Amino acid sequence: MNHSQTQDAGQVVRTVRPGAPSPVVLVCEHASAFMPASFDNLGLSEDVRRSHVAWDPGALGVAEALSALLDATLVASGISRLLYDCNRPPEAEGAMPARSEIYDIPGNVGLTEAQRKARTDAFYRPFRAAVGAALGSRRVGGYAHLRPRPPA
């Protein structure tokens, strides 16, 4: 990917093709399994951190391909959904889950309000700001939130 087509805001959120002409804005909330070292992997094994519980493997590649095909802006989270699930508001229990799928998430158990606020400020707010900036630069006649799921 050409660096001139990407704007980074640290590892929290990445905007690809910020000035793209398409009215479409793509959002990929579960693009990464990254966890900053200060979170000590939330107490999880490498196998769990690399599994679907931490991110949606392949989602970023699909989103980047669609971004290129549509010449559309893409906003992608740069952190694991276990640190903060960016498609959930701060008050949602699942924004920082103590359990996900079949796994307990030790680093999310017993979070204080101050810890939840710190994560909200560090991860959710920058992500939402990037989505807002991408949407705000377009004339929008409506929204469609598409969430593809694998067949059951």
Q: Which residue ranges define each predicted feature?
A:
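N-terminal catalytic or cofactor-binding beta/alpha core of small enzyme domains
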Residues: M1-A152
